[in-house]
Amino acid sequence: MVVIQGKGGKADPRVIGKDEEHQKSIVKLSQIKKIMKDRTRMRISKDALVAVSACVMYLISEITDGAKNVASTDGKKKVMPKHINNAICNDTELHFVGHDWLIKNGGMKSYIAPGDFAVSSKKGSSRD
């Protein structure tokens, strides 16, 4: 007679906590899955969800870091929407990604393309 013994009871909370620390994220994978599935009408793998989550976390960290720097240069201790807008406009890569983002109470976008000054000076000199 062979008796098979299995682990009974609840799982050890110390072991579960260590595994979940690496997967913890601000953005839930289920939310990303719902958005991607609604837009693509395809099945989404877990690796794709983790990759998109990492990209979103990177963008959030870049925007918050830039907004913190803008707020500190203004002498403020509180990050406001205008600081986020200025951070996106001042960073070339973030501006390339988010040039059409509208941030409520963010003020006007103050990005001037490098070629804008050259074009305006040529127009003024051709009138003579």
Curated annotation (Swiss-Prot):
One of its GO terms (cellular component) is nucleosome. The keyword Nucleus applies. The keyword Nucleus applies. It is found in: Nucleus; Chromosome. Its main location: nucleus. Keywords: Chromosome, DNA-binding, Nucleosome core, Nucleus. InterPro entries: CBFA_NFYB_domain (IPR003958), Histone-fold (IPR009072). GO terms for molecular function: DNA binding; protein heterodimerization activity. It comes from the Eukaryota. Core component of nucleosome. Nucleosomes wrap and compact DNA into chromatin, limiting DNA accessibility to the cellular machineries which require DNA as a template. Histones thereby play a central role in transcription regulation, DNA repair, DNA replication and chromosomal stability. DNA accessibility is regulated via a complex set of post-translational modifications of histones, also called histone code, and nucleosome remodeling. The nucleosome is a histone octamer containing two molecules each of H2A, H2B, H3 and H4 assembled in one H3-H4 heterotetramer and two H2A-H2B heterodimers. The octamer wraps approximately 147 bp of DNA. Belongs to the histone H2A family. This is Histone H2A. It comes from Encephalitozoon cuniculi (strain GB-M1). The gene is HTA1.
